[in-house]
């Protein structure tokens, strides 16, 4: 049976998410991000297109590296202003039945005890349609604003994230037994206290006696996403992630990451197929090639190199305004980096431009050759990019048996891993915390 | 012109909020608190009844004082399990147009920088219908679970809350100027960077350079509620609160608090009428007195003394299981305290039982004699208590000109303080932070 492709909409609760400069495009409605209807309309559109999930990126700091200032990011709305993505979920869940919501949250700034409750609450309210994209954040401005005194190195932030997840797993998987809530009216026992356990976590970064504040939600643990392609990031993915958002735009790079993470997963006793691999993709589709190119040119017209340099500075720490084009960063010249960023050719992700058939061919090729399971679909204009994809590419993928015609029933985890799999599999590291008793 | 009474529904994102034992009542649907539709149906009902707001209490710890254990609270669902109230708001805002949402959040556990963004996000999404009930929390179990190493004394927690609010005011009122966002397409300027200011806050508890992550929302600062009646709590209310949730069930007590807080407010240069006073009230109304008494008896039947003792223990720190009835706590014997709690006579708040006329009389009397402006309406059964009030008491109040017939247009602050008052008045302490410039 042909493998169905999973499609997520890649979004962010701000004006300028990724295609910087395009807020100026006449068809772009991103300025409506503060309006609840922008989001409920988007969720309904995505459900109409049978998308798996809305993937919401997030940052809690400002890009202030480029030109040693935050002004370019602020001027061009490069992920600032930026609102809290968790606040959007319940309204979007109310207007949909199947769409899932993968929301980014950093383990660097706020305590796991409060976060574990937020995610359990959202898993309840969405009836099991919530996922968490775990990030370890790297923005100095966020460190300062959250009063982080001791700035941890890149890899140690993943060590902290390991323990952060351990605390969450103990709360989600082990603190309340499945049949703790019994609602015994006769004996006035809503919850059997003997089935609610302290977790007594004592670690390097956190002391959390527990118990969890929430009764078990449909998935208990939200579907875990991870998106860091560094060595340490891939190790973290292999240990924790059920879905990985890969970097890279060509088969070789993607395949390397896919194979590497699946291999590492075995070390943790995990079935490598218990991890779905997502690649970012930019799609500009038209009924004809010319129509697609016309759209591309209209986007290129508003494309802002300055905006992308501000984003690049925040993401890498390199202020390219201080370099000459002949300087090198790693193996690439600054001239080449800047040239790449000045063109709309999908600097980080594969760009597929053309007819529905061409786009479907290129997506199918990446899936089959790189061994990935789905895509995070980038937006140029909102909601136009998704409208085009749903009207033109989805039918083509469905014709090839590569995309669902109707939603399957069940939670997000079941839609990814099959009916009945609404909880994490036993080979996941979280499963060891299921039989926590008070004396742990 | 007769003063209109403001009515809030008093709720909590859990099973057992306040009328412990009544989760067993056949008409009570509180077990549906994990279901999004419970909340959207409630919001629609309250808007039908022209309520001002849904007031959501919250705790992030467990009552574990009574019988030196958390078991009674867990067994009887006394505010555990408890989900996060902020996650509910966007769905309820989506199905209503006027109802406001006053949500409780503690200044003790999570950093103001993340909280300021959450509230700005909700003020945007609700189009100016969000309020924040500021609490300084007191539960040891929450202190442990959030890893609070240094437990602050009661009054010092208010000092920290003062600074917490100062940080938030600087972010909400001063960081982004009203016309910072200009959306100048021609010059690719979404936001004028010179109108986005760092706040450079440096205090005893927080260092927050800023700027805020969010563009100005309709109200900028959510409507500020406060609910602590200690000496320090009233001082805090006088300085910050626009709405105060008073303790007390008789005219004398309520009037003392009202007069005291209004007097203190003058010290801060505030017009005392810029503070609305809310008393808690329990209403059991029937078309006839007998019908009301029948309801009361059905509630009394399920009333749980043990549940209330668990709540009392968590709230006061006194484990009454260790006292004999002749012991005294303050000026009241333990026997009297327990006797009060065993009857459904509104242990903390005024109980009004009877016909619509009697209930309206008693509400009008409290408003006129104690100088209060509205009520937080307690629930016995959900949604029955609110349905009865809306069907029987609201028409009676409307007949007397004491209650709106239709909603006024505008934000929550405008509905409280009049059209055009969507931002904090100039006499509020937050106003001083409006002209923050980079060198503050």
UniProtKB/Swiss-Prot annotation, chains A, B:
<feature type="binding site">
    <location>
        <begin position="227"/>
        <end position="230"/>
    </location>
    <ligand>
        <name>FMN</name>
    </ligand>
</feature>
<dbReference type="GO" id="GO:0016705">
    <property type="term" value="F:oxidoreductase activity, acting on paired donors, with incorporation or reduction of molecular oxygen"/>
</dbReference>
<keyword id="KW-0547">Nucleotide-binding</keyword>
<dbReference type="InterPro" id="IPR011251">
    <property type="entry name" value="Luciferase-like_dom"/>
</dbReference>
<dbReference type="GO" id="GO:0000166">
    <property type="term" value="F:nucleotide binding"/>
</dbReference>
<dbReference type="InterPro" id="IPR051260">
    <property type="entry name" value="Diverse_substr_monoxygenases"/>
</dbReference>
<dbReference type="InterPro" id="IPR036661">
    <property type="entry name" value="Luciferase-like_sf"/>
</dbReference>
<dbReference type="GO" id="GO:0004497">
    <property type="term" value="F:monooxygenase activity"/>
</dbReference>
<dbReference type="Pfam" id="PF00296">
    <property type="entry name" value="Bac_luciferase"/>
</dbReference>
<feature type="binding site">
    <location>
        <position position="58"/>
    </location>
    <ligand>
        <name>FMN</name>
    </ligand>
</feature>
<dbReference type="InterPro" id="IPR016215">
    <property type="entry name" value="NTA_MOA"/>
</dbReference>
<protein>
    <recommendedName>
        <fullName>Long-chain alkane monooxygenase</fullName>
        <ecNumber>1.14.14.28</ecNumber>
    </recommendedName>
</protein>
<feature type="binding site">
    <location>
        <begin position="137"/>
        <end position="138"/>
    </location>
    <ligand>
        <name>FMN</name>
    </ligand>
</feature>
<keyword id="KW-0503">Monooxygenase</keyword>
<comment type="function">
    <text>Involved in the degradation of long-chain alkanes. Converts alkanes ranging from C(15) to C(36) into their corresponding primary alcohols.</text>
</comment>
<comment type="similarity">
    <text>Belongs to the NtaA/SnaA/DszA monooxygenase family.</text>
</comment>
<dbReference type="GO" id="GO:0005576">
    <property type="term" value="C:extracellular region"/>
</dbReference>
<keyword id="KW-0560">Oxidoreductase</keyword>
<feature type="binding site">
    <location>
        <position position="158"/>
    </location>
    <ligand>
        <name>FMN</name>
    </ligand>
</feature>
<keyword id="KW-0288">FMN</keyword>
<comment type="subunit">
    <text>Homodimer.</text>
</comment>
<keyword id="KW-0964">Secreted</keyword>
<keyword id="KW-0614">Plasmid</keyword>
<keyword id="KW-0285">Flavoprotein</keyword>
